[in-house]
């Protein structure tokens, strides 16, 4: 079976490569790639990790002009109304209010030498966070029930964030006394996130942008690419059988935005912060890497500053850091703003992306969206609304864990739309989710929607209301705050004697590494590669595998770079 699967996967890859080559030749005869018809020629997207709106901007106290009416308005945040609190399961008479400041990284050691845990954000966790809990007559905790197949999601009051953080989402009725319940309610002071705050005040802050799924990273990031998760409602699993998802990556009935762009002769690029970008989990992406659609983020500034840069759609993947380290902590050392990493690294990434575009020759024709995939378990006070189901098929039945119908949005996340065509200090109260990005791109570039979700989604077009580009947008942003974090404060220097099992999200990133490795593996060795991957159970095994794949990918990249340099040098000599 493994041999047949591997062989069929190899055949599909060859046909995909051949189709891409034919398409390139057709484009060369038909004048190459198209240029978008409207004033926006370039859409840039930066999606960070696991932070709620209130957690990042809840105390920013932003006033401005309503994007729809032009009237004075205020962001829906923690500085108005209230109380904004959650009940404490261990002290029902003492609710915990949202407060500031937050810690720069949850991996920072506390006074007792321990680390706060990473907040839960799987489907069960979010169900509890949004719907809260009750107690029966014997004072036993009663958790919310799963939505039925008809997707009748329970009533939402955003009251279960502390309960989830203290362990109730384990569904064992046990309330932990070891977790500081206030951690999940703490939000950043504007001085801690000066880059994000400056952009929110300078351009358009969207205070009703919700994650597309009340769940974790993987399905939410898929919605950015496909307006669907193909039925995935939790972190992936099911890698113990030779499924199509394992060997080829995830697929979607109606394809992705990249298929739509290519079908209309629009170019696109993904700039990746490390060797294992999440988008590689999508079928065909590892092959598209060979077609020149993927570049390292280190090349971003040079590419965008080229006067000939003509890519209409750019998606930026952050560095996710030490996803599978040999220490007990994960996600440290990146710039994705994962809760276990130093948030100022992500602030620095946002600053770099903005300043590169702002000072490039293409600024006047650009739109940049900075947002987050999901809330990461952190408190937000706004109840997410219902929405349209994508209406496509479930592509991987083994990954539809809860029978979820995708008619309920997830927790609110920060979103800032940035362009010289957007008036300064705009506040947008329009309801959005991640498929709104695709609806906007489809509107700007004349593309058809992918699913019912993006067909029904609100677009960002109305924000681009200026007839001529602004000239007062800052050319530089404030420096990120000083977190005071050094390497040994986030657990990177302490070796762990534990070799625990992989979490669902760790296995998902491991799968991305496998897909990269699998594409480079000769056909006769593919069955053995599959078996080796399926035998990985513990962090040490996964860490060794990913380090080896990283080494191979880095070596291959250096070889390609050397060849390019050699060609440029020889071309110069011929000239």
Protein language model features and the residues they cover:
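N-terminal pro-sequences and low-complexity stem/linker regions of secreted or lumenal proteins
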Residues: 2, 8-575
